[in-house]
Amino acid sequence: MAGSNLLIHLDTIDQNDLIYVERDMNFAQKVGLCFLLYGDDHSDATYILQKLLAMTRSDFPQSDLLIKFAKSRPETWRRHLVEALCIIGARKVLRRLGFCWQELRMHYLPHIAGITLHVHPLLKSLYRMCEELSLVQSGRLLLDVREKVESQQAGDPLRFYDPAYLEIFLLDWLTRRSIKLGDINAAGSDVQLLVGHLKSNGLQAQANLLKDTIISNAPEPDAAGTAAMAVKQEIESDNQQSYCSTQIDALKLTRENAGIALIINQQKFHRNVSRDNMKFLSPDPLRRRDGTDVDKERLIEVFSSMGYNVEAYDNVDHMGIIERIRSACDRSLVRDSLVVFILSHGFEEAVYASNSIAMKITDIEDLLCSYDTLYYKPKLLIIQACQEKLVHKKKPNELFRIDVTTVSPDQHIDMLRAMSTVNGYAALRHTQTGSWFIGSLCDAIDRRSASEHIADILTIVTNEVSKKRGSNDESMVPNVKSTFRQHVYFPPRL
């Protein structure tokens, strides 16, 4: 189908065909298509936003969105529709309409962002951004931008919370004029909130996508320079206002979305396990850990004061530990961080559950890193447990292994593990006043969290603990390892 024939074939599409076009698309495709078709006009965007929200509340959403669009733009709807279908990659629909995908691809260039024939170029780039962001990244963007929009404007907030449909939130911000497309050449556009968030969260490619779209569509050289300067000013302004950015290499967690602080507090131990699990048991009964409740209460006090949702559990068996960690990870999509404390007995690279089953610490770390909900978010695993080297007869026959895998080194980014002691040694705990490590950690957060980032706080803890001496000259040195990419600050305390 040559270019001229393609245009002739466009005119053969009938409005009655649109009923079947909608039936062939899933809801996600409808959202993307309607965003591209309706988003460039304020009243149209307002209309389609309400229609899409109504569809999200229906189990069997039926609609005539495309027929409405065709009637509103009788002269141009076919060209807009086919280009938008190309952009969202709706090949099945286009084949049913009689088009050849390769010819459409050469004509409309859907794979090249910022270049369009009929659809607004910024809408195409915004759609591309939505497709490129992970679910977690979309969740962080909507949380950040929605907070800023609501702080600047009156009116009812959008009562929709699914980041899988980020285009719905973009339509809301367009109708509120918090972001602006400008004219067909993107003159008068304003994507300050989006570009600033993308840059401050390491999403430079997506930030450049929006900036380049504005610059490349400016009709005159002077206009291009003006657009570039406007984008630069928007980025600088947004970085100054960003709730999570204190400097280029710093992340400041917020009280409102600090996250979950999960405490597994093991005081009493038993050996009532199935025959299959006996190989994971400690060779000898484990002693009661007096003083651990002091640590638990102190952690609850300190982390609650920073806005964390503290969840503390006593005497949890191995499967209970896994279930509680998984639950916390599942609920961390729109939270800034996750902190997990395990207070127990242990030995080198292992920690005990309350049923005396030994668990591999690196498996627990991998479990935290395996969740998309925590991708590029601070994850803290803090363990108070001995890490002594044991002779073979003092070890379990096997360590219980968690069924978890990570497939990329990137999943381990922003992970911090803080151990009460270096490998090979005991972790000291007073039966009345609690452990040296947890006590020093809470003291350091009390004194320094307003001015020091987490890594520096733990350096202070290591220094203070290493100076302590027990009644028999015992000593201890904590061990911290981290893949944080920037300085991370705890939320402000009350």
From Swiss-Prot:
EC number, UniProt record = 3.4.22.61
**So what does mutating residue 436 to R actually do?**
In L23; blocks expression of DptA following bacterial infection
Query: Enzyme class, one word?
Result: hydrolase
Gene3D superfamilies listed in its UniProt record: 3.40.50.1460
> Where are the catalytic residues?
345, 386
GO BP annotations, alphabetical order: apoptotic process; defense response; defense response to Gram-negative bacterium; execution phase of apoptosis; immune response; innate immune response; negative regulation of programmed cell death; peptidoglycan recognition protein signaling pathway
Q: Which GO terms describe its cellular component?
A: cytoplasm; cytosol
Q: In which tissues is it expressed?
A: Constitutively expressed in fat bodies of larvae and adults.
> Domain of life, per the record?
Eukaryota
Subcellular location per the Swiss-Prot or TrEMBL entry: Cytoplasm
- Database matches in InterPro entries: Caspase-like_dom_sf, Dredd_2nd, Dredd_N, Pept_C14_caspase, Pept_C14_p10, Pept_C14_p20, Pept_C14A
The UniProt PTM text for this protein says:
Polyubiquitinated by Diap2 following activation of the immune deficiency (Imd) pathway.
Q: Which UniProt keywords apply?
A: Apoptosis, Cytoplasm, Hydrolase, Immunity, Innate immunity, Protease, Thiol protease, Ubl conjugation, Zymogen
A Gene Ontology molecular function term for this protein is:
cysteine-type endopeptidase activity
Q: Which reaction does it catalyse?
A: Strict requirement for Asp at position P1 and has a preferred cleavage sequence of (Leu/Asp/Val)-Glu-Thr-Asp-|-(Gly/Ser/Ala)
Propeptide at which positions? 1-242, 401-410
- Cite the PROSITE patterns for this sequence: CASPASE_CYS, CASPASE_P10, CASPASE_P20
Keyword Hydrolase appears in the UniProt entry: yes
Q: Which SUPFAM superfamilies does the UniProt record give?
A: Caspase-like (SSF52129)
Assembly, in brief, is: Heterotetramer that consists of two anti-parallel arranged heterodimers, each one formed by a 15 kDa (caspase-8 subunit p15) and a 10 kDa (caspase-8 subunit p10) subunit. Interacts (via N-terminus) with Diap2; likely to bind Diap2 simultaneously with Fadd to form a trimeric complex. Interacts with Dark (via N-terminus).
Instruction: Spell out the PANTHER family in the cross-references.
Output: CASPASE 10, DED DOMAIN-CONTAINING PROTEIN
* Family listed: Belongs to the peptidase C14A family.
Protein name (record): Caspase-8
Species, as recorded: Drosophila melanogaster (Fruit fly)
Q: What is the lineage of its organism?
A: Eukaryota, Metazoa, Ecdysozoa, Arthropoda, Hexapoda
Identify the coding gene.
Answer: Dredd
